[in-house]
Amino acid sequence: MLETVPVRCVERKITSLVVDLSGVPIVDTMVAQQLYNLSKTLFLLGVKAVFSGIRPDVAQTSIQLGLDFSEYETYGTLKQALENMGVRCIVEELEENK
């Protein structure tokens, strides 16, 4: 992850990246550290990292490790993160208009 994501972001001129953790069943100390390193690397490349779907146990693991994610935007769900970035879910709008 740490090797490919930053390279792809630069290649594709990505300015913001949502890292959604809602489908990740277990986050141990190594994964939490990798996420932190990824966010710092992206910052240095000018890519804004946004986190969504962080569960309480993931937050606790990060705090226990002394990892400070407070400088990053975090959202409870991917939908909230995307809406805040101005991305609207067209599928839901189509269903609502039926």
Curated annotation (Swiss-Prot):
UniProt keyword Phosphoprotein, yes or no: yes
Annotated keywords: Cytoplasm, Phosphoprotein
Gene3D superfamilies hit by this protein: STAS domain
Predominant cellular place of this UniProt entry's protein: cytoplasm
GO cellular component, one term: cytoplasm
Pfam families: STAS
Post-translational modification as stated in the protein's UniProt record: Phosphorylated on threonine residue(s). Phosphorylated by PrkC and dephosphorylated by PrpC.
Domain STAS: 1-85
Subcellular location per the Swiss-Prot or TrEMBL entry: Cytoplasm
PANTHER family: RSBT ANTAGONIST PROTEIN RSBS-RELATED, RSBT CO-ANTAGONIST PROTEIN RSBRC
Name of this protein: Uncharacterized protein YezB
